[in-house]
């Protein structure tokens, strides 16, 4: 405390000894020095601030450069790999956002293995692959039909029905993919029920089953050996496919009632190869001969001539291949598998002519037996009569079954397994009642004599105004 008082008294004494002018000059010089000190401090602070800002600017510039490099790198990676849609995650937030915004469009879907992607999803533009387009055969007087392909009128008519043709093509593409899938796994030792259900499950997925708008056109036929057509297993059928069997796979798909009816024959023993070749050749001959204004009987005659030109040797015996004369091809209508006209596979049929815009199933059956089939075995195929009117029904169970048929199948064919699948039970008496009333028609298996072998090939053709399209044609047959 004493030291502070002495300094204060010394200061006051010194001030008291100065003149007033000297005091003013001292005060002015002190103020100038203080101002200079403040200026120096400000300069230092400005210099320090400037020194801090310059590194910040350099850091910002380096971040921007890194960002630009990352963006360039991301663009190069996208160009190299169009399928890569996600960012690496190493860049900053802004770069990540840009990558998300600039995602590449997804490429077209591809079919899975086993097939499960609907055909309509594989072709999102709604335009489906065409079948084999052929020029119509020349007329009897030698005139060609080449003019149809260039006629503006015929082109306009063809275009007017493009939506219809497109429905057939979608159903045909489903058929092609299903049968390709079937050939990859069908083998001896499988039960017929297993084969049919596996096929039908795949067909339902690819056709994108939707009530009466899209689905299966008729039950899967898998007729064996002497049985030529209309066999599919009922519940409880334990039949197993054998190495020496000859199996006709006949199944159909439809879009909006536009039916694809197409069949092929499966064998494992090469001894049947010539029989299959004969029937396939006969079917292709029928397709080649078919056309606008062609008589149905002329098609049948050409088919018979080709088929009977083949001989086959099976187990040491030689057979002439015979066309099954009471089985035919047929015209196809909307939701109607047999639309009224028949295409014979022997000579002497109807002289009715094929017409522009019609659709036909050209199918041939060859046999080593008598060449005639008869009803045999337990019935599995049924179809509502297309022309039946209102028929009064008394029994409630029968009424219920008819409602189920109308809602799920309409006038398309069905089988007992499909009724089981819908949860129906104890329906056999009701089904018999519907058959007795003529509302539903039964289609039992059709067989040649025991010990004979039968084969089948079939395609659906469109008689378009400009050309003939074998819409179900594939790489397989």
Swiss-Prot record:
It is found in: Cytoplasm. Residues 54-78 have a biased composition (Basic and acidic residues). It holds the Pfam family Peptidase_M24. Its cofactor is Co(2+); Zn(2+); Mn(2+); Fe(2+). It comes from the Eukaryota. Gene3D superfamilies: Creatinase/methionine aminopeptidase superfamily (3.90.230.10), Winged helix-like DNA-binding domain superfamily/Winged helix DNA-binding domain (1.10.10.10). Residues 1-121 are annotated as: Disordered. Cotranslationally removes the N-terminal methionine from nascent proteins. The N-terminal methionine is often cleaved when the second residue in the primary sequence is small and uncharged (Met-Ala-, Cys, Gly, Pro, Ser, Thr, or Val). Protects eukaryotic initiation factor EIF2S1 from translation-inhibiting phosphorylation by inhibitory kinases such as EIF2AK2/PKR and EIF2AK1/HCR. Plays a critical role in the regulation of protein synthesis. This is Methionine aminopeptidase 2. The lineage of its organism: Eukaryota, Metazoa, Chordata, Craniata, Vertebrata.
């Amino acid at each position: 405390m004493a030291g502070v008082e002495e300094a204060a008294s010394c200061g006051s004494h010194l001030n008291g000894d100065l003149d007033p002018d000297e005091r003013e000059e001292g005060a002015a010089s002190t103020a100038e020095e203080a101002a200079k000190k403040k200026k120096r401090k400000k300069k230092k602070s400005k210099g320090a601030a400037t020194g801090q800002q310059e590194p910040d600017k350099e850091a910002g510039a380096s971040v921007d450069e890194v960002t630009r490099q990352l963006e360039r790198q991301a663009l190069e990676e996208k160009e190299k790999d169009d399928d890569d849609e996600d960012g690496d995650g190493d860049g900053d937030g802004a770069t990540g956002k840009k990558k998300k915004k600039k995602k590449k469009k997804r490429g077209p879907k591809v079919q899975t293995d086993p097939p499960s992607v609907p055909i309509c999803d594989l072709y999102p533009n709604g335009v489906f692959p065409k079948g084999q387009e052929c020029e119509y055969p020349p007329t009897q007087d030698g005139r060609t039909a080449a003019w149809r392909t260039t006629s503006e009128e015929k082109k306009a008519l063809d275009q007017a029905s493009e939506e219809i043709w497109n429905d057939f093509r979608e159903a045909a593409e489903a058929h092609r993919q299903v049968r390709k899938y079937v050939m990859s796994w069908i083998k001896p030792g499988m039960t017929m029920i297993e084969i049919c259900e596996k096929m039908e499950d795949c067909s339902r997925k690819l056709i994108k089953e939707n009530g009466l708008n899209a689905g299966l056109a008729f039950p899967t036929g898998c007729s064996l050996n002497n049985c030529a057509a209309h066999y599919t297993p009922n519940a409880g059928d334990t039949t197993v496919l054998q190495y020496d069997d000859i199996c006709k796979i006949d199944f159909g798909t439809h879009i909006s009632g536009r039916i694809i009816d197409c069949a092929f024959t499966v064998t494992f023993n090469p001894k049947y190869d010539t029989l299959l070749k004969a029937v396939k050749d006969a079917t292709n001959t029928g397709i080649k001969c078919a056309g606008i204004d062609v008589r149905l009987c002329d098609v049948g005659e050409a088919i018979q001539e080709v088929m009977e030109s083949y001989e086959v040797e099976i187990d040491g015996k030689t057979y002439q291949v015979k066309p099954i004369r009471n089985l035919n091809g047929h015209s196809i209508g909307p939701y109607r598998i047999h639309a009224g006209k028949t295409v014979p596979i022997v000579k002497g049929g109807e002289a009715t002519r094929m017409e522009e815009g019609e659709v036909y199933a050209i199918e041939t059956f060859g046999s080593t037996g008598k060449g005639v089939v008869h009803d045999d075995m337990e019935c599995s195929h049924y179809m509502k009569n297309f022309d039946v009117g209102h028929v009064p029904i008394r029994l409630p169970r029968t009424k219920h079954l008819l409602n189920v048929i109308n809602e799920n199948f309409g006038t398309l064919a069905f089988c007992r397994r499909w009724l089981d699948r819908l949860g129906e039970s104890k329906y056999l008496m009701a089904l018999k009642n519907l058959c007795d009333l003529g509302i539903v028609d039964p289609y039992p298996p059709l067989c040649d004599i025991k010990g004979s072998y039968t084969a089948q090939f079939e395609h659906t053709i469109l008689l378009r105004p400009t050309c003939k399209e074998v819409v179900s044609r594939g790489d397989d047959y």
